[in-house]
A protein has these predicted regions:
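Glycan-recognition and processing domains
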Residues: 69-71, 78-81, 179-183
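Short, solvent-exposed loop/linker segments at the N-terminal edge
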Residues: 206-213
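Surface-exposed, low-complexity/disordered Ser/Thr/Gly/Pro/Asn-rich loops and linkers
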Residues: 80-97
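Predominantly extracellular/luminal regions of secreted and cell-surface proteins
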Residues: 40-77
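Beta-strand-rich binding/interaction modules
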Residues: 138-140, 213-250
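Aromatic sugar-binding surface patches on proteins
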Residues: 153-156, 250-254
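Accessory beta-strand-rich segments of carbohydrate-active enzymes
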Residues: 1-28, 42-48, 95, 99-201, ...
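N-terminal helix-cap/turn-to-beta initiation motif at the start of protein domains
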Residues: 29-38
């Protein structure tokens, strides 16, 4: 997938747009290094043209605390600030037609030992937003990561090249107001490390009567790991009895 390095206001005109977003996949339990980035974030409400807000977001420094996951309309302090901003705008007269409201959210974090070790070994690092409302632009360490018009299903971005060699990292999010509903990062945010050879999707399919089924795995591997062997096993309900297993070199059918 070609990476687009700069944000564009034109994406806001396409309700189905997503930029640099990884392919949507099913969810399964994994032992990959995973760091949760929820809890306390910082937030501020802003107004201006979309182009002005995009330029401003990675540089913004005036914030107050909020909770993630959360809906901003349920954050009392945020609601009061928004009401004050609305009154101030009304006092200045009719806003320009290209003026928009948005929220800038920010989170600083230090990599935990497992993802830090994985990053130093060259593993792929992905940043996932479990759910959000309103168009979202995101930066990591000041580098544009991606855009998604809505996030009612998880949106993941490859941030391997965006992670800078520094002790403290910073996520900046521009979340445009949505006139249709409340907005905010309403599900978990996480950072995951993926090894050179890893499963990217699990697609099970069963017959209507449950007597047969199939499982398709989508596996991604780098040039350095193209000699890897894939092994799959089907276990009983107690996960002790191995009902079926098979193995094959990467790129071949099991």
């Amino acid at each position: 997938m070609e990476h687009i390095p700069e944000p564009d206001v034109a994406w806001l005109r396409d309700p189905g747009a997503s930029v640099n977003r990884l392919t949507v996949h099913s969810t399964w339990r994994s032992r990959r290094p995973l760091q949760m980035l929820s809890s306390t974030w910082q937030v501020t409400g802003v107004s201006g043209t979309a182009a002005e807000l995009i330029k401003r977001t990675p540089l913004q420094r005036d914030f107050e605390a909020t909770s993630v996951p959360g809906v901003l309309e349920m954050d009392g302090a945020w609601v009061r600030r928004e009401e004050e901003a609305r009154r101030a705008a009304e006092a200045q007269g009719e806003p320009a037609p290209d003026q928009v409201r948005a929220s800038i959210l920010r989170r600083e974090f230090i990599l935990d030992a497992p993802p830090k070790d994985a990053s130093e070994r060259g593993w792929t690092m992905t940043l996932t937003f479990g759910g959000f409302t309103g168009p979202l632009y995101v930066w990591l360490d000041g580098i544009f990561v991606g855009f998604c018009a809505d996030g009612f299903i998880p949106a993941a971005f490859d941030v391997t090249d965006a992670l800078q060699p520094m002790h403290t990292h910073e996520i900046s999010v521009l979340l445009m107001d949505s006139p249709a509903c409340c907005h905010g990062l309403f599900r978990e945010v996480s950072l995951e490390a993926r090894p050179p050879a890893h499963v990217i999707d699990v697609i099970p399919q069963a017959s209507h009567n449950g007597t047969s089924g199939s499982l398709r795995l989508r596996v991604e591997f780098s040039e350095a790991s193209n000699t890897s062997t894939i092994r799959a096993a089907l276990l009983g309900e107690a996960q002790q009895e191995e009902i079926w297993s098979a193995s094959a070199p990467a790129g071949e059918d099991l």
